[in-house]
Amino acid sequence: EYQGKSAPPGPWVKVPEWKFDLEDASETFEQLLAIPDGDPWVDAAKDNLSSGCPVTAAITVEQIRRAKDLGVAECFQMELKIASRCIQLPDFPEGVRALLIDKDKQPTWTYSKVSDIPRDYLLSHF
């Protein structure tokens, strides 16, 4: 097992500890966006979260929830399965189109909100 060392404290590390409901991706997403503004790191993270693919946000919440009971090798296996599934579905090429090809930064996601994502669709990534 690898045991990492913690980073020295810095201005961006001084973020209060928040606890999130990882059982519900939509609720977790809303809790993250409700974190008060003011810290540049938190503000940038919230901007990225709100402008990114809702399915990816939901996947990340589910992935974190599952990873707490897994080892490193199992986490990498889960990551590979998720990535393999994501490239089969329309949101990945849509994100590439909007960011890299047309550069319009106006993706049309499969689901416009995390709360719209059916649980079965989310779980199909795992």
Q: Each predicted region: which residue ranges?
A:
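C-terminal alpha-helix plus adjacent terminal tail
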Residues: 1-126
